[in-house]
Amino acid sequence: MASRIRAIRKATSGIPRGGFLEILILSLVFVIALAVRLLPLRFGFYLSEFDPYLQWRMTDYVVKNGFLAWFNWHDVMSWYPWGMNMAQGNLYGVAFTAAAAYMFLHAIGVQATVFEVVVLFPIVGGALTSIACYFLGKDLWGRGAGLLTALFMALNPSNISRTTLGFLRHEALGILLMVLIFIFFLRANQKGRSPRGTITYSILAGLTLFYLTATWAASYYPLDLIVLYVAVLVLTGRYTRQLLLSYAATFGVFLFLTPLGVPKLGFGVLSTLSFLVIPGVALLLLAREAGTRLPTWRHRAYALAIASVVLVGLAYALVELKVMQLPSGKFLSTLNPFTRLDMPIVESVSEHRPATWASFFYEYSTLTFLGLFGFFFILRRLRDTDIFLTLGTLTSLYFAGSLVRLTLILAPPFSVLAAIATVEMAKPAVDILRQAVIFPKRRIPGLVRIGREFGLAILLILVIAIVPAFSRAVAAAYAPATIATSSIPLIPSEGTKYQDWLEALAWIHDNTPDSAVVMAWWDYGYWIMALADRKTLADNGTGNTTQIAMIAQMFMRNETTAIPMMQRYNVSYAAVFVTYARTQGQSNPSFLGAGEDGKWYWMVRIANQTSYGNQTILFQERRAQEQVTYYRILKIGDKVVANETISSGQQLNDNSVLGFMMNTGVGISGATSDYFDRVFTSSNNFVLVYKVLYPKTTVATISVDKNRVKYGESVHITGTVTDSEGNPYKTGTVRLEDSVNGEAKDIAVADLADGKFSYDWKPPAGNHSVTAHWSGVGGETRSAVSSPALMFVEPIPVTLAISLSSYNITLGQNVTVSLRLTEKLSNGTFTIRYSIDNKTWTVLTTVSPENGALDYSWRPDRVGALYIQASYSGAGDFGPATSGVVVMYVKP
């Protein structure tokens, strides 16, 4: 053992003590960075967020099929039915690197799965970024600043949130590559660097920039930052031939490789503004180089001004001729945040929102103030590298304010600034502790030696200023993976689980056919493809905004108009995510807004003024005090064919597909549907899966052999039940319903044989409307009601006789009117009327018979001849009857 210790001491004796301490500190920083990013492991070993599931699929594909196969991969799982050309729609840097890491581990005997590699990959990338930031800080301000930069970056909340366990997105590799680009390019331009060294570092910068471009769409930022930096150096009189050489070598390599090696960008990227500035600044460099051969500074300034004007004019011409492509989409919204108001698909994503000063302080805490002090120190020195750091800080600060997710690109320069401030503010304290102040031999009145306790106090204040930022770092890391809480933004308490999406995806995987197509909002596309292994209409790439608008339409239309659209897309299942809570004393639950209950507003905005076929759908919002109401308008051409209220307040009505699914799923509504059958409900009722049914349209017919029969005669009823194309339904039963004199009742249930049914019936008297009712078969055929078969059954005839007790009476004398039916009936009504001219009649009374008879006593109030007649209304199977007219004479 002693010999081994001596051997180790001998081996390390050649290492300078300062260098050894530096390596030790960097190792500790690396371990701290790994440990902090591993904190989410408490909640499970998952990929986090949404995009990492795409990277996992791509990594797995590369491992199984090889790197070159990826460039020919047409993925049929996404954007059904069109699919996606993966090389044209995605960047491959992260997936290729993760696949290479997997292959390397297997080559050295580490038998890890692809999933294990991709879950752990981000934390390694984040830790390596901290080490890279050490070299950046060291090159800019020395070793002390480098070590602090590494520590600040290791514990930076913005960086942690994007490089934590399972967060396999572009940022896990992108920030590391961006920092390396800065290191290589700045080293290429270090004073005293040989041309060979300059070219070497420039080539490394160009290769790394190409690698970043194949990895992260935000590669435009470091690219254009370097271009801007070079332009500023030229315009401020800091031009050197070394700068021209490094610029030419860096972008020569980059422009040669990128159009060929990144299919998503292709050669078309060369006409974009971000790339056209590269040759523009190259011309500026050449003009400045040519100016060095001019005799005076005035001539050089004129040459540079002319070159600048020519470049501006050329850029204007390229824009007018539409040769230059200006930024669009989320890139435009980053440059100009106001344009996102017209981009609902961009604005609907929470990480695309503008940042606030509160969010900056939340991310950087007390380092915010140290960063401001660091800015003061670099402005006071203002070397070339300080100009680069200034430009990097200002531009990243602007973009971070424009897009909250881009606070990440602010992390490296801000960490460097905070490190510089800490070093510069700690220097006096260290000098005091070391007693490094040299006092003159001659005593100077008033000069007092400062004790070491003042140095300790300064260092303690700096530590107190830094520690709060580190505590926020732990809080940023100590959060579960998105899918572990079903994307609900909370940390579950002990014993509480919100794994509704994991349950739903497992159910879809195990209980639906492999060919099933699942319609869901685009947020969940990557989850459904990766974990449920099923096709989706859209995913988080949002590459086809037209199809996303169609999904929004299908969710916001009523089922009658949505089902034909779903059938066109061959939708098998629909999955919705709705968050709610039940409060004691409330009859209905309250929506929380973390699922579609908060996203349907964006569906309305995205679907608004979009068309399907000849139909255009529009949505209108009306506000009355605190109440917000949405209306859905459907137009064909200029004609409004439907105008319905779809919501009152936060809650959607049942007359939209999403409203029906949400309301029935959480128990607000008891509505039913022929098209949607809820087949899965997660444990917390947050994720609902509906099977989409496409029942055949049913056509039922009915007819009778006679439309007019006498009472007691039999009627033969026949009919058919077929689909809309005339194909008969083989078996089943048909309910026959009769509506007689406005009263509906069932006649019988007839059996269906090869699409036909028949029934013999003796109908009661009256006017009949007979219909056939097919109840349908769930998910296969729709219910149907036939057009009515009309029929009249003549009632049993009866006669009515009328007589008077006296036909000649005196005024004031009573007379008895006697009525007799040929049938002894006690239902129906008698009506007795009289007339003085046998034309205009006055009703005397209406009364029911008793056993077919009535004796009515009447005292006339006028003299002369009175004509008297009675009628019977008829009842049941007996018809009406009218008596003859009798005449009575009343004397004065």
Identify the role of each PLM range.
Residues 1-41, 50, 133, 147, ...:
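Start-transfer (signal-anchor) and selected internal transmembrane alpha helices
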Residues 16-52, 57-58, 64-70, 74, ...:
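Transmembrane signal-anchor helices characteristic of membrane glycosylation enzymes that use polyprenol
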Residues 387-390, 395-434, 440-443, 456, ...:
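Hydrophobic/aromatic-rich transmembrane helices and adjacent perimembrane loops
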